[in-house]
Amino acid sequence: MSNVFAGKKIAKDTIEEDYVGSGGIFDTDIYQAKIKTAYIGKAQSSEARNVTLLLDINGRELRSQTWVSNKNGDVTYRDKQTGEIKNLPGYNTMNSVALLVAGKNLGDLDTEELVVKLYDFEAKKELPQAVTCFTQLHGEMINVAVQRQTVDKTKKNDSTGDYEPTGETRDQNEIVKFFAGEKLVTISEVAEFIKSLGEKFDDVVDSGHLLKAIRKVPEEAGIFASKWLERNKGQIYDKSTGKKAAEGITSALS
């Protein structure tokens, strides 16, 4: 089966930059995970695509969905300030996974249609569904920086079709950074190491030697992970708006 990202026009800079910033809720930390399934999803109303990872962390499942293309199916956008063509952040994120795990860009991975059990929100249970999978990632290890967040509970407004805050909150997890499976280095740190050797990152990828280069990166090069842990480990990030509750207070006082 063809890879929908194969041949996509991407920006020259394909390296995700470093910014410190379902199986139950994980505390904020870095975890080693096995990739159970990696598959492509599509929006119902457009050509937008996402990639979902089902991860096994010590027998517990963590699901991560990342949108990698816009409604037209493009993976790039034009920066309004500079006019520069850049990759969408979601594409760079999933491209970093492909590079760290398989040593290839996302568009160069082999894909295969498989039937896997996925949660169906209408049926409210897991059902067998056919999805396009990145099978080269299946069974491989990766390290993930997981953030615990408090967010709004939402409910669909039948008149507008939009999902709006109910005034209640729930906790969820979000993966904010991926690292190599065997050591805590990001793809950006790998690229810097390759540059320090006088080589070009793209040349190393194209020659099929990226995984070998990752193995050679010294442990002390993994600066981002230690800084992220120092700043974030154990924290809960409140991203809720309190919108519904605020509206209720306003109504009561009016």
Task: Name each model-derived stretch.
Residues 1-254:
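Short beta-rich binding modules
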